[in-house]
Amino acid sequence: MPRIVIVGAGLSGLCTAHYLVKSLSEAGKEAEILLLEAEGAPGGKMRTIRQDGFQMEWGPNGFLTNKPHGMELVKDLGIEGRLARSSDLARKRFILSDGTLHRLPETPPAFFRSKLLSLPGRLRIVWEPFASGPPPGVDESLGEFARRRLGTEALEKLIDPMVTGIFAGDPDMMSLRSCFPLIYDLERKYGGLVRGMLGVRRERAQQGMKGEMSAGPGGVLMSFDHGVQTLTDALAGRLSEGLHLCVSVDRIERRGEAYALSMSAGGRREEMAADVVVIAAPAYAAAGMVSPVDEGLSAALRAIPYSPITVAALGYEKATMGNPLDGFGFLIPGGEKRKILGALWDSSIFPNRAPEGKALLRVMVGGVRAPELAALPEAELLAMARNELAEILGISDKPVLAKAFFHERGIPQYLVGHGKRLERIDARLAALPGLYLNGNAYRGIALNDCVRESRSAAGRIARTL
């Protein structure tokens, strides 16, 4: 019986194992599936922490229904009854501009009426259908794209905070095609964003789809009553026999047609043979593992950078806050020169995030914009976050809860040239049959993307056995 070893039991590793079991069963095939995790618990960054009645997310806080993959997995696991739908308030998102919070418009007409942009800035967006086309043969940055089609003001006040909220990155460094392939395709298919939105609206109408198309990410934000860890716990529960914790793989070698994994488990050095290896660890960890197999592959993986980010969770008494937190939260353009990237108003987004009469916020610090701030000592960082909230939201009370979660290498950065790097990685893997890479460092950082890529990888592996 062939042995498949998956290294890393975060979302991507757990999903790969889940879909492998399913694909092999449907194909009438058998294999031994082992899942090795260096930490003492599965789930990776999808971790829910509870303290004093507050429920905090260590990393991501949910997934959108604008793509089907997350909901399909939830139904596959039979945990639909545990889902939590975001409040309608979650559609109200804010941008800080000139020291004032402005609601982010959701539709093109609302954009034109918004005071977030100046009149010249709004007129520049109106001119978008007449903007120049994409430069041929160039991996354009998101910043270059936004300046070309929407103007500098839209880049600074809309696109920059959006990239901060998703990647904690710099739009002038991020690849449009790799970060936002749908926008890239929209321009090439329809000749522009406004034409593209009108074209998609016509297609939706022809297909009988109702509802106005939003300029935002679309879909409904979903989580679970007891946090996002519900999903990874459900996946891990299906794989309990094959899941091994506190096993750190540091080296993979080619042995004939198979692979040998060197690892540390319980203080002992061990070696394990495998016919198929799926590395579902971060790119920087994968780089070290594959160095003995292919130094060129290792170098390509090491070249994928990550932005550091710290999440500061702050709980307050609602009665004395002086701010209703009526919305999803706010993001801050770099031009505002603030010390935080933004904040999510978690207890306004989902139920059960704070005890009765209290509110929970999560403040984002660091990113590419200010990596040194993410690494501040916890007490200093929490004090800074409190000061920023006092100046922006008027919340001056001492919090009843204050915790910081530091992610030294938090979010992979799809820089200009990312697509070419993936081509080099794929070419190297083609010469190493039985070795696969999976995770959020390659073709999408969102939960839906990770589920989609895991299912695809499992299908490819099942077909080769």
Where are these regions (language model features)?
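Dinucleotide-binding Rossmann-like beta1-alpha1 core, especially the glycine-rich loop
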Residues: D52-P134
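Conserved flavin/dinucleotide-binding core of flavoenzymes
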Residues: P105-P109, P324-G327, G342-L465
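Conserved Rossmann-like nucleotide-cofactor binding loop
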Residues: S12, A41, Y284
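Glycine-rich FAD pyrophosphate-binding loop
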Residues: V21-Q51
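Beta1/beta-strand and adjacent pyrophosphate-binding region of the FAD-binding site
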Residues: M1-S12
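Conserved hydrophobic helix-helix packing surfaces used for dimerization/oligomerization
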Residues: I4-I6, I33, L435
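Active-site/ligand-binding neighborhood in enzyme catalytic cores
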Residues: L89-K92, R124-I252, A258, A273
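Mid-domain catalytic core of redox enzymes
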Residues: K22, L245-L361, V368-A375, A379, ...
